[in-house]
Amino acid sequence: MDEHEGDRVTESHGTGPDAFEAVLNQLDRVVMGKREVARLLLAAMVARGHVLVVDVPGVAKTRMTRAFAASLALSFQRIQGTPDLLPGDVVGVSVYDPRTADFKYRPGPVLSHLVLVDEINRATPRTQAALLECMEERQVTVDGETHRVAEPFMVLATENPVEMEGTYPLPEAQLDRFLLSTTVGYPSAAEELDMMRRLGTEDPLETLRPVASAADVDTWRREAARVRVDPVVEQYMVALVRATREQPGIRLGASPRATLALIRSVRAWAYLNGRAYVLPDDVKHMAVPVLGHRLLMAADAEVLGDSGADAVRRVLEVVAAPTETL
């Protein structure tokens, strides 16, 4: 890769690795030991995608999302998924104004920059569908009128894998709309001790200051879209996605939408790492979070505890990565 030594992202105010490091350092102050998750959130934002977090309660998903929004000076709203949550509670409603004798649109929380949908699978399919339009079309339609969401826009939805009673599992079509899926996980003993000492008396979230802006995010997105992908790396990504459709134990493989999600994600990941070109290692790093949740496992594989992430790891072992100089 010697020919790429000078092929780095050009840094300016609010761009480049230093800007990303500043955002990650902010998140480290609020949530200890979760830098990899924070990097995935940042990659999803740069790639114009949404994130699904499947994890137990109490592992700082809300804190991380709030800190992420505060660090980027973005508006933030949290929606709690419940069976009685209506589409209007998400996208907004038209309210009659007696002063003008007309209906006025009252925006819902989904028109914020960063939206946390907690326990999305507790919302009814009808409400999930309303959210789906926002995620895919980046707009909402209320009483025949269309309203664009704020940009940059990202939805971070959570699911609790333990309590599944009274839930409405997300259909495959909606899972496919999430660019990435990840878990936060419990902290290590050392991290939990550090958290107790640092957060037991004061909350750094209350004093967090922005280190970037919505304009910076827009710049990141435009620059990441120009990151080069060599044809052999493109072929490698297509081979990985196609292999998920042929592996035993997988009832439904990744769709062509997954191929597009993968190339957007690896471009963003390379950009976050200060490169204007993609390496096969970028593809390997992003394959599980991008593809794992899109696979529908066969019943016998599920009984054995086999997951989509496990299947993607097997695919990575089977499909050879390019080794020639890019």
Where are these regions (language model features)?
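Conserved AAA+ ATPase core "coupling" helix
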Residues: P87, T167-E223, P231-A239
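C-terminal engagement/docking regions of AAA+ P-loop ATPases
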Residues: R8-E11, E246-L326
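AAA+/P-loop NTPase substrate/partner-engagement loops
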Residues: S71-R99
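AAA+/SF3 P-loop NTPase mechanochemical coupling elements
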Residues: K104-H113, V142-E159, L170-L180, R257
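Conserved alpha-helical scaffold flanking the Walker A/P-loop in AAA+ ATPase domains
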Residues: R39-A43, Y96-L116, E145
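Pre-Walker A (pre-P-loop) alpha-helix and adjacent loop at the N terminus of AAA/AAA+ ATPase modules
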Residues: P17-V56
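Walker A/P-loop
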Residues: M45-T82
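Conserved AAA+/SF3 P-loop NTPase catalytic/coupling segment centered on the Walker-B
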Residues: L111-E136, A150, E165-Q174, Y186-D194
